[in-house]
Design a protein with these regions (language model features):
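N-terminal helix-turn-helix DNA-binding module of bacterial transcription factors
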Residues: 1-12, 290
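Alpha-helical recognition/docking segments in bacterial nutrient-uptake
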Residues: 11-129, 192-197, 208
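Nucleotide donor/acceptor-binding cores
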Residues: 12-16, 128-132, 136-139, 200, ...
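Hinge/beta->alpha junction and helix N-cap segments in small-molecule ligand-binding domains
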Residues: 23-36, 54-63, 116-126, 142-163, ...
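Residue-level detector of anion-binding/catalytic polar loops
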Residues: 51, 100, 137, 168, ...
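Periplasmic-binding protein-like
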Residues: 76-82, 140-143, 174, 196-206, ...
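Flexible loop/turn connectors
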Residues: 185-290
Length: 290
């Protein structure tokens, strides 16, 4: 038996680093979303006999360069970079590295790089269209008070559906809420307490905002969905256990992670490819909040 074949299979040099970039940590928290993405990356690495190491980078000018250098002079063969909280300028030091980098969960028009992300525009469009068809009225928007590229794209998909239905973008009622359950709950209570005008249905930038807002509305005597309908985004496990269960946009999270790992391994095997952008489509999950 030719044992050299076994040896060959395991000679992948170095590890793949999943680098989680934390700017303010309000969006990249330890939610099931990110654990499922990590699971996908882990599966993708296993399939190709690469070891996976996870590294956190916290935004702080002085230490970023040092942190990136540490990765560069380690056993790192390539990086999957979680760009959820990043801005275009934050990418530069990573792209100067002599190893391949795949950006996950973000995309910037100004930076040519390989990236894998959610089709946010399509997801938000589906959500808004569902609200318009079901509620026969103009949906409001529960937007994140912290802006990241994902939310900007969701905003664009939401307004695209509004315009496609012949409605005016400027007429949608918008509330800015903290993108966490507790934060959105407190902010929405404030909106209600201040007597601000409420829409009869809303699209929320993510499930955490949706669930926090639903709790605030219910605690203030509103019935969901009879008085106010809501659609979230992410399809977190939490959405199926609240009452009523949350209508939301499903994102194939594990697949995103696997696709990013596969892309990085392709770049390691065949360097010099032109950068590509991979968008993973979403799906409307109809439950009880509309």
């Amino acid at each position: 038996y030719d044992f050299s074949r076994i040896a060959e299979k395991h000679t992948t040099s170095g590890a793949i680093y999943f680098v989680i970039y934390k700017k303010h940590g309000t969006v990249v928290a330890d939610t099931p979303f990110f654990s499922q993405v990590s699971e996908g990356i882990s599966q993708g690495c296993k399939k190709n006999d690469y070891r996976l190491k996870i590294s956190y980078i916290y935004e702080d000018e002085d230490t970023i360069t040092k942190q990136i250098e540490e990765i560069q002079y380690s056993d790192c063969a390539g990086i999957i970079l979680l760009g959820t909280e990043m801005e275009a300028g934050d990418l530069k030091p990573f792209l100067n590295l002599p190893i391949p980098v795949v950006l996950l969960d973000a995309y910037f028009e100004t930076v040519p790089c390989n990236c894998v992300l959610i089709n946010n525009v399509q997801g938000a469009y589906l959500a808004a269209r569902h609200l318009i068809r079901s509620c026969k009225t103009q949906p409001g928007y529960l937007r994140s008070a912290y802006q990241i590229s994902n939310f900007a794209e969701r905003s664009s998909g939401f307004y695209k559906a509004i315009r496609a239905s012949g409605m005016s973008s400027s007429r949608s009622i918008v509330h800015s809420l903290t993108p966490s359950m507790e934060g959105a709950y407190a902010d929405m209570l404030e909106v209600i307490k201040n007597g601000e005008e409420l829409a009869s249905c809303y699209f929320a930038d993510n499930d955490l905002i949706a669930v926090g807002a639903i709790k605030a509305l219910k605690d203030s005597g509103y019935r969901i969905p009879q008085d106010i309908g809501i659609v979230g985004f992410d399809n977190l496990p939490l959405g199926s256990v609240i009452e009523p269960a949350l209508t939301t946009i499903h994102v194939p999270k594990q697949y995103m992670g696997e696709a990013a790992a596969q892309k990085l391994i392709d770049l390691l095997n065949t360097p010099g490819q032109p950068p590509t952008k991979t968008e993973v489509s979403t799906m409307l999950v109809k439950r009880g909040t509309v």
